Amino acid sequence: MKRTKIVCTVGPGTDKFGILEDMMRAGMNVARFNFSHGSHEEQAERMQMVRDAAMIVNKSIALLLDTKGPEVRLGLFKEGKVFLEAGQQFTLTTDDVEGTKELSSVNHKGLTGDVSVGDKILLADGLVTLTIDAIEGNNIVTTVQNSGEIGNRKRVAVPGVALSLPPVSEQDEADLRFGCQEGVDFVAASFMQRGKDIVAIRRILESEKKDIKIIAKIENAEGVKNIDEILEVADGLMVARGDLGVEIPAEEVPVLQKLMIEKCNNLGKPVITATQMLESMIQNPRPTRAEASDVANAILDGTDAIMLSGETANGSYPVEAVATMTRIAEVTEKAAIYDSYSRAREDEEMTTTSAVCLASVRVAQNLGAAAILTCTESGHTALSVARHRPDCKIIAVTPHEETIRRMQLCWGVEAIKGHEIINSDEMVKQAITGALGTGAIESGDLVVVTAGVPSGATGTTNMIRVHIAGRVLLSGNGILRKSVTGNVYIAANHKHNYESFKDGDILVVGTMEPELMAIAKRAGGIIAVEDGYTSDSAIAGITYGIPVILGAKNAHEVLLEGQEVTIDGERGKVFAGIANAR
């Protein structure tokens, strides 16, 4: 099972029937909706398609709304596009004009006040560079540094300049309120430059009474400079390498990627590495070697999730792109030596939750546990465990569907549905039973359970327990390929008075005496010391269609009256408690 999550952008390439289901089966965890394109009606239709597909494949898929953000763009050109020659003069104006080879409008009215003579302006994702020669009223006069084509609505970037754009445009606000109505799980906030930008978005979400998690997209030098204050108020980060590589030198992006991932790991906040990860697969069925290395290195850096953009939204091979990413993740995770404490430093001032989660990782590591089970309301406990990157599985048991979906962005966490309970014993039992039921753990696995008591409150994680799930108590020869769980009833303890026997009890006998046949008929199963497929115990099991374990020599010494056990006729095993005896 891959531990790195995959975010897939949906679009025309995923509209064909069955594509989304196949992408989910291939490893998709989160559906991204790019609100730079498409109407609300189109986005709502695709969101419903994702929900329907997730129901078909029985998988939880989170929805992520990616805002257009405060962008500066060119206006419309008379011919739709023009070709600029190196050395020519080209003017940008805040007036509304039709674009020509010499002039274009821009949508940011304050641009003339933000820039200075000598600044560089990049057009069309950095394909054309301009140098500012003069600022004359509403006009910015520039010289074209290199030839290239530009066209309608192409992006305008001014590296190193903090533009006076509002963090949330009118369109963004409308999109956010639409997302609240549609029940999205995450908002990817584009072009975040400072902490107050995140606060402005959160204010809109809270006005709709929605607790939607905000993933800050770092796409310019100002965002990089203020990364720490942004992370104070954001719920996670997206390393948006495409726009970031336009705003700052491309050679600096790999180092910044590692820096931002490390900061998120240390804080226990999810981080997505995005843009051009398998770009060639938009048109080709296989990635380049460089792309495969890029994906693998992001995983080794510690990213929680890796993202596909045009590869799935508009590409010819969306399913193959997801499957390729899954294979790269699985191979990288197996080869990588994940030290449990290399990804996150211990806090100088630890909270109770962080201390208990770190301790649970250490206990699991030392005991060789198969899984850490976290009983969680909001998912915070699972995130706190995941920040230490344990070698074993992390299984979050929660009563809330929205928490299950949020965990789809968290490294290594598998979320399953539970129900609200207060008693700690019931909490542990539910976690183990749920994990066994989904096949996340197997009978006999040692697991570490962490939770908060009393339950129901966020941030109260204060309990660690070590359990063996479905511990094997006895082995013998099985009759009938079925399993059953019930309470132990030891016939020898009742001195020929069996009135206390309840339907479904597990009858324990030395030999099947004739007087026991009446209650054997009502038993869930039989555990017998006697052996042999022609023994009376075997005949009783076959006659009444119930599983029998024969030759359980130490049954009377090992089992306790009333103990809950599971007997597995196929494997000839008796497990303690409820076991997923498949």
What kind of feature is each model-predicted range?
Residues 25-30, 181-185, 205-210, 232-237, ...:
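Glycine-enriched alpha-helix->loop->beta-strand junction motifs that scaffold or abut catalytic
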Residues 88-89, 261, 265, 272, ...:
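ATP-dependent carboxylate/acyl-activation modules
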Residues 70-169, 173, 434, 440-495, ...:
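Acidic, glycine-rich flexible loop/linker segments
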Residues 10-13, 28, 35-38, 67-70, ...:
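Short, ordered loop/turn segments at secondary-structure junctions
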Residues 1-65, 69, 291, 306, ...:
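N-terminal intrinsically disordered, low-complexity, charge/repeat-rich segments that act as generic
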Residues 3, 8-13, 42, 161, ...:
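Conserved alpha/beta-domain cores
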Residues 41-44, 50-57, 101-129, 195, ...:
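Phosphate-interacting basic helix/loop segments used at nucleotide- and nucleic-acid interfaces
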Residues 1-12, 16-17, 24, 39-44, ...:
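Expand to "…catalyze enediolate/carbanion chemistry for C-C bond making/breaking, isomerization
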